[in-house]
Design a protein with these regions (language model features):
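Substrate-binding/catalytic subdomain of NAD(P)-dependent oxidoreductase enzymes
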Residues: 1-74, 79-81
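Short secondary-structure transition/capping segments
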Residues: 35-44, 91-99, 165-174, 217-222
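Generic structural hydrophobic/aromatic packing signal, biased to beta-strands
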Residues: 37, 44-46, 61, 82-84, ...
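Catalytic, metal-anchored helix/loop core of enzyme active sites in primary metabolism
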Residues: 51, 57-153, 158
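A conserved regulatory-domain signal marking ACT and ACT-like small-molecule sensing domains
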Residues: 112-222
Length: 222
């Protein structure tokens, strides 16, 4: 989150305080989520995401599902990567080791040498471009896709009710996977939505009747 605050400030020429970065860890993620996501062609990554649209900026760190063919899906182990998408550069990714004794020591020594040999005054363009016009987007205003892992009552009409609750908040279903029945009368149902407003998806989930289905987990999809 600290790195995201710095990088977003530099990239967007705006003040992006660390305190304004949304942070969510991986404690709610289970092996079941990872397995189902893999079946649907996705991998799970803990991503730091910064986006700018017009005069609004969103910054967030959370577990995210990305498609198997996304460049970031192959970044593993001690490697870190920065994936960029811009109007002129289109798609670009920078990758390298970001952990371990030697990579870390090399980066620290490089910074020390740079500070000792280069004028380290902050570039005035950055200082003066605090971009008072830019505003941070709050959680409820994000727009992304969502992976929903549900446990539903295995009876006629359950799917129709779920679709109705989602559509009532303008949330549409992109793809769905229902697993074979487990012990009891409930079955796992996996839904990936089209892009939706975060406030809308939460409002829709609040309408779910626990007698029909329960939400086991919700993961954002990029």
């Amino acid at each position: 989150a600290y790195k995201l605050s710095i990088m977003a400030s530099l990239a967007f020429h705006a003040r992006v305080p660390f305190s304004k970065v949304y942070r969510e860890g991986i404690t709610k993620i289970t092996a079941v989520d990872i397995a189902y996501a893999r079946e649907m062609g996705y991998v799970l990554k803990l991503l730091a995401i910064a986006k700018r649209s017009g005069n609004t900026i969103e910054v967030r760190v959370h577990p995210t599902l990305i498609a198997n063919d996304h460049p970031l899906s192959q970044v593993n182990g001690s490697f870190n990567a920065v994936y960029l998408h811009g109007h002129a550069c289109k798609e670009m990714m920078l990758q390298g080791r970001g952990a371990g004794d030697l990579p870390t020591a090399s980066a620290v020594v490089g910074d020390i040498l740079h500070a000792a040999t280069v004028d380290v005054h902050v570039h005035p363009t950055f200082v003066n471009s605090a971009n008072a016009d830019a505003s941070l987007v709050f959680t409820n205003d994000w727009k992304t896709r969502y992976f929903l892992r549900l446990s539903i009552q295995d009876e006629p009409g359950s799917l129709a009710k779920i679709a109705t609750w989602l559509s009532s908040e303008q949330v549409s279903i992109a793809t769905m996977m229902q697993k074979a029945e487990l012990a009891g009368s409930r079955v796992p149902l996996i839904i990936i939505t089209h892009e939706a407003n975060e406030q809308a998806i939460r409002a829709a989930l609040a309408k779910f009747d626990p007698e029909v289905c329960t939400v086991e987990n919700m993961i954002r999809v990029e």
